[in-house]
Amino acid sequence: MTTDLFSPLTLRSGAVLANRIAKAAMEEGMAAPGQLPDERLVTLYRRWGAGGAGLLITGNVMVHAEALTGPGGIVLDADAPLEPFTAWARAGKAAGAAMWMQISHPGRQVQANMPGVTWGPSDKAVELGRHSKRFGRPTAMTADQIADTVTRFATTAARAEQAGFDGVEVHAAHGYLLSQFLSPLVNTRTDEWGGPLENRARFLLDVVRAIRAVVSPSFAVAVKLNSADFQRGGFDATDAHHVITLLEPLGVDLVELSGGSYESPAMSGRPADPSATADPSATAGASGTADSSATAGASGTVGANGAVDSVGIAASSTAAREAYFLDLAADLAETSSLPLMLTGGITRRATAERVLSSKVALVGMGTALAVTPDLPARWRDNLEATATLRPITWSDKSLASIAGMAQVRHQMRRLARSQNPSPAIHPAYALTTDQLLQSRALRRYRRWLARRPKSALAITPPTRVVH
């Protein structure tokens, strides 16, 4: 029997989501001075909350001020004022939705023109062929830096709860830092954080334990995990199953499944190797296997969070292209003791219902809600979206992919100004505008970071939130 899209979902923490539809994380790139949320994000999330989704997950909020995916990123660390975050949480929850903060560290996936640090499990850089120079070469993290970053995740989670958020989602997908440690292609360490999967998962598990130790039992803790990296010899569905098993006793409420990384952007429908999913014997490095011309844009070289839905090709999307991680998710749902959320390419109610029929508990959408923010309410009224993004037919796939994400951010900025989406926006205009805004944001971020004292190791661990 198919679970109804509009039935509630009770999580292990006791939290109840009003329905099975979630607004998945998309990096908004709208940080105000000081890398803080302002009235634009308040307006944007109030709009999404009124649109009928049971859960809103923010774009990835950075736990380390010196490590951002893009210059418009939000930072919530020990020094950030809470008032802007309180207003953000209150706006998202105003119509009854739960509001979770996605928290993340980019690791090696930092643009080369960004100040700060570029860290990874090893010194292996992002490989995108002729686009590789867009990213800096990472430094392999020390034991102290790993321990410090665990504490940073816990600090951000504790402060998110203090600000009024209902939960956090730890970003361990799309090739960001925790995902890098999980990947045998990126993590070549030979110490306690490398080698067997149990070691490669240690960082993530320590982060979850640290968060659970400082938040209240009723505060939701979720993990975003790749169902596969879609690179031969990389993290695969068998690994995902094992990690879910390791997470189960740690108090995790939900696992969101996606896939891919900057090198293989399956999260935007463009995996480097679609067959590289659950074959543990697959070898042959992913180096150079990614279609760099399709990768650079989805990689967020202008600040994307890793697209959570197909971008720039929405007009030609079919049922075959929708929910493109569903087969992997359905297999994992058969054995998972944790509720799963599936994100990637879902735009129609029929597809969402097909996802739920596979025993997945929650349906996540990103781009679809940037174009049609009230899509859940429309589905409740048996209506569908009436608009899709203008298709991009440029021969330069790299430029087309970057422009696709720019189109999505253009929609979010319009919503944040209380305007209606403009899905017909010309991609060239969206791209030019986006790059101009990112350039301004980079100058502002550089000035802000230069004024801050350099972050020290061994920051004081947060204490548990008391209610």
Language-model-detected regions and their locations in the chain:
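Flavin-dependent oxidoreductase catalytic cores
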Residues: 1-467
